[in-house]
Regions:
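Active-site beta->alpha N-cap acidic-glycine motif
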Residues: 297-381, 385, 389-390, 400, ...
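Catalytic domains of cell-wall/extracellular-matrix polysaccharide-remodeling enzymes
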Residues: 334, 356-357, 380-510
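Extracellular/periplasmic catalytic domains that process cell-envelope and extracellular macromolecules
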Residues: 109-110, 129-131, 241, 314-316, ...
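Second-shell loop/turn segments in exported
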Residues: 124-125, 147-152, 321-323, 327, ...
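Compositionally biased intrinsically disordered regions enriched in Thr/Gly
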Residues: 2-314, 320
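Sec-exported extracytoplasmic/periplasmic mature domains
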Residues: 83, 87, 91, 140-143, ...
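Solvent-exposed coil/turn segments that connect beta secondary-structure elements
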Residues: 120-122, 141-143, 254, 327, ...
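Soluble periplasmic/extracytoplasmic beta-strand elements of cell-envelope proteins
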Residues: 116-120, 137, 321, 347, ...
Length: 514
């Protein structure tokens, strides 16, 4: 296989004593250094990147994530992790200042078999700066998104990688054993202890995971994830493949005395040392990293999808579905402008008769990632209608939306929330009501509307507004600001019920997590 030929090339270059880069050119370095293979997602064929930024009075948040189709497991995992980190950040804001959280992604490898990404989170608060990073690997064979441990054969291979880092830090940076940081230092000290007569042959070295007898490989995704839990503090969490075919491990300069005033220290594990540490996925990932990153058509499904809202797992997040009934109308465009400021995706339960009257806002809703629901043709009470009339009314509205947007409304909201058995049997879509009624049609008071929404919303709530009222639209900036400050993410009705497989005629009011 190709791994064998790569191995020969790498070992040849290593034998020549060269710092390996493509073509085996020599690059003089004062200190041991590895050039990591990291590529912006937009530079990878077939992959796009989407950036979400919200600038509020109390904070600035942004994140960029890769899009490999609307529901690709890696897209969902990356965006959900970033959204969760944003929620944690917002829930822990100080009383003063305007801290910032900026999350980004780069591609470590991409082929039809595997995609690896690096996620970074940079926080700024006053004079304080912090950067954390993690890596994820998508295995196309299993369809699983796995942590960094998937690159290694087993726990022993991870320990040997730590020892390789210890040698570089000790020999290249002149770090004495007692200054070797974290688990790298523990591994080196444990190895030194094993090289001396031990008081008990059965004793397990401090800080090292205990291997089960005969266990030689991370044989399934659960074991890979368990290993990541055991090695939470390992610098290998932020490892990439180097241009030399080995590993490039990012370490905090504060942990490496003598590194100088640099942003990051990239410690190399040479190709020859890494060769026997990698898992089968690791070999495939290395080949992808060194071969130019082409994920292929099979790995980028639905590449033309423009529905970024379908990439959040709301079962793990604080999500809320803002819904707007009875439109579109003369205020709908203003509402869409307001929603865009928070990258908020909403659901509009439209009247078929108004779809024909206000086609431009409807087209804009679809283009900007919002969802259109069916609210009947002209707001008749479905519970007072026979089954054939219900079918005709809903079908007519579906067709009006489909003609403008190319999609059929996935859900129906009966006017007044009025329904009965005939309605449930006659409608071929799920029926979605609400759990938070802002009573905006009654109060016509922006302050009262926003206060009600902010105090009654819970994770999984479906909140009812009406975009035909100016006062309702005027309340939305405060609603968005307040819920964003609480760490919420604004999604469509379909997103908030994601993965639950709602049935035709099924009635739901919310997707509350508690």
């Amino acid at each position: 296989m190709a791994v064998t030929s790569l191995r020969r090339k790498l070992l040849l270059c290593a034998a020549l004593g060269l710092l390996l880069v493509p073509g085996c050119h020599t690059v003089p370095q004062a200190l041991p250094y590895a050039e990591a293979v990291r590529t912006p997602p937009e530079d990878v064929a077939g992959m796009r990147a989407r950036t979400v930024t919200v600038e509020a009075d109390h904070s600035v948040t942004s994140y960029r994530y890769p899009e490999l189709g609307g529901a690709h497991p890696l897209t969902v995992r990356v965006r959900t992790l970033m959204a969760r980190r944003q929620t944690d950040f917002l829930e822990d804001l100080p009383e003063r200042g305007r801290p910032e959280l900026h999350q980004d992604v780069s591609v470590l490898a991409a082929s039809s078999q595997v995609v690896g990404v690096r996620l970074t989170a940079a926080t700024e608060a006053g004079m304080s700066r912090d950067l954390t990073a993690d890596t994820l690997w998508y295995d196309a064979d299993s369809g699983e998104v796995l942590p960094w441990t998937a690159l290694f054969r087993d726990d022993e291979a991870i320990e040997r990688a730590h020892l390789a880092l210890a040698r570089v830090l000790r020999d290249g940076y002149n770090l004495p054993a007692q200054q070797l940081p974290g688990v790298v230092g523990e591994a080196a000290r444990d190895q030194a202890a094993l090289d001396e007569p031990a008081p008990s042959p059965s004793a397990s070295p401090r800080g090292r995971p205990t291997q089960a007898p005969g266990r030689t490989e991370f044989s399934d995704p659960d074991r890979v994830r368990e290993a990541a839990e055991r090695w939470t503090d390992s610098p290998l969490r932020d490892a990439a493949f180097s241009t030399a075919g080995g590993l490039a491990v990012r370490m905090d300069p504060a942990q490496v005395p003598g590194a100088g005033m640099v942003r990051e220290v990239m410690v190399p594990i040479e190709a020859a040392d890494a060769e026997d540490l990698l898992s089968e996925l690791g070999y495939r990932a290395r080949e992808a990293a060194l071969s130019g990153n082409d994920p292929g058509d099979d790995l980028v499904p639905d590449g033309d999808s423009d529905t970024p809202g379908h990439t959040l797992d709301c079962s793990q997040l604080k999500c809320v579905a803002l819904t707007f009934d009875d439109g579109p109308g003369e205020h709908t465009d203003d509402l869409l402008d307001i929603l865009a400021g928070y990258d908020a995706h909403a659901t509009f339960y439209v009247l078929g008769s108004l779809v024909e009257e206000f086609p431009e806002p409807v087209e804009r809703m679809a283009a900007e990632g919002h969802e259109l629901g069916n609210h009947t043709w002209k707001h008749d009470d479905l519970a007072r209608m026979p089954g054939n009339a219900i079918k005709k009314d809903i079908g007519r509205t579906n067709e009006a939306v489909r003609e403008l947007t190319g999609t059929t409304p996935p859900t129906v909201r009966p006017p007044y929330g009025s329904l009965n058995g005939t309605v449930r049997r006659s409608v071929d879509q799920p029926l979605v009501l609400w759990d938070v009624d802002t009573l905006d049609w009654q109060s016509r008071d922006p302050e009262a509307i926003s206060e009600h929404a902010l105090t009654h919303t819970a994770p999984g709530s479906v909140v009812l507004f009406h975009d035909i009222h100016r006062t309702s639209v005027d309340a939305i900036p405060q609603v968005l600001a307040g819920l964003h400050r609480q760490g919420y993410h604004f999604v469509t009705v379909t997103d908030i019920f994601g993965g639950q497989g709602l049935e035709p005629g099924e009635v739901r009011t919310d997707a509350r997590l508690t």
